[in-house]
Amino acid sequence: MSTDRPPQLRRRPRDRFRRRLVASLTVFVLVGAVAAVIGAQQGPRLRDVTYDPSGLVSRPAQRVILTANQALQRVSAGDVTVTPAAAHTVTSSGNTIAVEFAGPLAYDRSYEIAVTGVRAPGQPATSELRTTIRTGSTDVLALVPATSRTSGTSGTSGTSGTSGTAGSADKDRIVRRSLDAGGATTVYQAADITEYARLGRSLVVVSGTDGRSAVDIVSLAGGVQDPSAPVEHLTLPTAEGRVTALHVADDGASFGFEYADTTTGQSRDVGLYVVDMTGTHLPTAVAADGKPTAGAVPMTVAQWAYVPRTERALVRTGSDDLVLVDVSGQTDPVRLGSATYLHGFVGTGTTAVVETGTGVVRLDLTDGKRTPLAAPPGSTDAAYLGRIAQLDDDTYVRVVGDVRPDGTLAQRILRVDASRASRLPVVVPADASITAVCPSPNGQFLAVATKSATSDLVSIVDASSGALEASIDAASVDWCGALPSGDEIS
């Protein structure tokens, strides 16, 4: 008898595998077909939303990216609605839609983005993509002099953080104050702090008296000084010197200041120096030709500031020439005529507001074109006309004042647009004077710094209504670092 199995019995396991494979493939095909049918009937769906809450309130041209679950036909600006309304543009590619906002949004606010008529290529069904985003809140860094014993909201004493350490009362303190919470946190403290600025995840701090300045870079962790990281002490151009007019590039790649050699007891070689944070961290003079040059005699400076969101600086020289300097040294400087004062920048930073011998103009930094600044009735009817601070492309605030019978100045703040000027209802004590008015990065708030014979105070007010949001017993806040500095007027 033969022991061989029939051929069909040997093939039976293979046939069983084939049947299972065919069945599985059939299920996958059916599932895919059903999904395709459902997708064709329902239209695309929202899969993901990405955005930077802090960037949306501090910088223009920030994007919210909506990602769908499939490729999309082109989406136009007319298909997108933002509530509350905010100027925006729209681009789409593949399965993503980018909503780019023209300017910073309001702090701590919800915005709904709706996209209608969304369709996949070749599919008849349309759908609506809808999402709600929440913007970030804001805070300020304020300099509290050593003589101050309180900070935070008016009437609230003490601070949190490291403010309770021994000896803190004898030191100046840089504190962080959030507008959506009471109290303040000490970020850094040292003797004789004169200026400071945020530099990425660090602080640049200038300190010293009697023409002997020091410049330190302080690492931060959790928003306060990192105790595990040593403070970096910069080597200055001479053994003794005075540092003023500190400014930092928005990207944190560099910072600069006005420096005067005081080794002889007099100020010599006063001019602009910049520090490249990607290089040696050594201050380099900006030469008279407008180029950073090691060892050069520096360009004289009356006022200067970084152009927002660039590595360029706008400089008014000691002879009132205007020069646009590339701090990185990659492009040649551009000379833009002359001016008697730099007020600040408009919107995205391509336009500056400057004072000339014939009036205040808007200077286009791309082509040098000058146009008169809007000055409706009531905006210049005062004996004293102070600094202009732009809130947006069309609106600015300005400190003006009249002389009282006793010779003191009665100051007020005007809010000015193209057609009218109105007084912002901000109370200035009779015994105090306004030393600075500085907009928040999105123009929603103003920091109004006042000084009396006995105290310093910074009031944070709504830029539209003048309503008080917070107050700090401090001399200055970091918002003012965006304004050109040098020879100052309020």
Placement of each model-derived feature along the sequence:
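Short coil/turn linkers that define WD40 beta-propeller blade boundaries
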Residues: 180-182, 211, 223, 278-280, ...
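Acidic, low-complexity Ser/Thr/Gly/Pro-rich repeat segments typical of extracellular/periplasmic
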Residues: 2-139, 166-170, 180-201, 206-208, ...
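Short beta-strand segments enriched in small/hydrophobic residues
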Residues: 138-149
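Beta-propeller domains
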Residues: 320-323, 329-354
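Extracellularly exposed regions in secreted/surface proteins, prominently low-complexity, repeat-rich
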Residues: 453-490
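N-terminal low-complexity, intrinsically disordered tails enriched in Ser/Pro/Gly
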Residues: 258-263, 267-287, 294-328, 399-403
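Structural motif
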Residues: 148-176, 210-221, 261-276, 316-326, ...
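Acidic/hydrophobic-patterned starts of short beta strands in beta-sheet-rich repeat architectures
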Residues: 255, 313, 352, 396-397, ...
